[in-house]
Amino acid sequence: HSIRRRQRQMCIRDRYPVYERVVEMAEGAAILANVDYKVSLISGIYETLVNRSGGAIMQNNLEILGPIEYSNEEIEFAKKIQEVTSKPQDGMDSEIRPLMDTREHPGGGSTDVGDVSWNVANINVGVATAPVGTPWHSWAVVACGGMSIGHKGMLHASKAIAMTMSDLYQNDELVKRVKNEYLERKGNEVYVAMVPEGPPPVNDN
């Protein structure tokens, strides 16, 4: 039998001791049961280091671009998606909201972007590619991504990213601000990938 242990919503400096404790527990259980055991670390992901200096640049460019405009056909498609997924039929929401505050406890989810953010300053942008309330990781999102609603969102995000990169290329002061915040948030932490070197143990998953 296998024992699976997931650790989420923990900063990396706290996660290693917990992982080591879990390994010790597995070893103790194996000794008590007089059986062999094997530990396979299948995945391990760092939390994402935010960069508000970079986020402010991206936010400014989103506001320059303005909200995405949708056709009547796209809005009707969005409402149909909401109907079949039992969501309020509110259509699309293209409002550009203010840059959100950095939350101490941002909630669940994980991404290897977190690992990247410990090696280089990272700027994220979120743009609508599906109707309000659409369940993520579902066929409904895929359906929207395969038609103009998703295409418009992807192009809008691409424009905001390109404009942000252009700002950084042309303004050394902006680069300095982003880099300084990255170094301050990272502190003295040294990035070490949690997953061991070599091919991933996919057969153990």
Which residues does each predicted region cover?
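Divalent metal-coordination and catalytic microenvironments
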Residues: M58, V116, I161
